[in-house]
Amino acid sequence: MSEQAKLDPEPWAYHLLGLISPLLVISGNLLGVYEPIYAAMGVIFIWVVGPVLDVLLGETKVPRPPRDSGTPFEVLLWVHGILQLVVMGTFFWFAFNTGLNIWLVVGALSTGLSAAASAIVTAHELGHTRPRSPSWWLSRVLLFSVNYLHFTTEHNYNHHRWVATDKDPASATKDESLWHFWIKTIPGQFKSSVEIHNSKGKTGFNNPSYRGLALQIVTLLSLAFIPGYLGYFDGIPLTVGWIISSAISILTLEY
């Protein structure tokens, strides 16, 4: 292999393979309305097929320098973000038609696993953009779709500064178990985000972290009870499914 070939940036088109997960989940949610087993497509690909391919393909041996232009990757972030909104829309349609049963849980797992990348990881990248820009707002919508609105605040202002220290709730200790880390990091990151806003003078209900939490709770309760009260449809399955998918996406992120 020539020296020039070793220095060529990796083709950005390879990263289109990352769209397989959300596209499979969208398909599974839609087909699952007619045959529920299709709702497992995302789980099977992400937890079974993906890891097997990862082992078989192995690690790349070719050094890949950064590309001169980051535009293709910025566009790809937007594609992931838009697909996440479609994923959630199709999941709500699936939950509406399926009701409370084991297939709702399966569909929520597929949806949540996809959202861990297409929602939270994408929001993490977009969260570094200029506040109140279109990309910044998309990151807020994506975090709302998994009920984790405070994430970018804690990540950008605390984790980046104190990573791998006792001041970072998102860093695990050497001998810490996964379960203990989950129990520590999730409330710890919310508490950290509250403290960050407090330090900027945004206390009480002026604190965006508290406002975000209130918005998430009110939205979940409204979805659960208002449609049924008005006689439109039972919102409980949609709410339960949303909570499960949010939980699995958050746990996957913090894994």
Describe these PLM feature segments.
Residues 1-113, 126, 145-240, 244:
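Non-catalytic, topology-defining segments of multipass membrane proteins
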Residues 87, 110-120, 131-134:
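Membrane-embedded alpha-helical core segments of multi-pass
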Residues 142-144, 252:
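Short, surface-exposed linear patches
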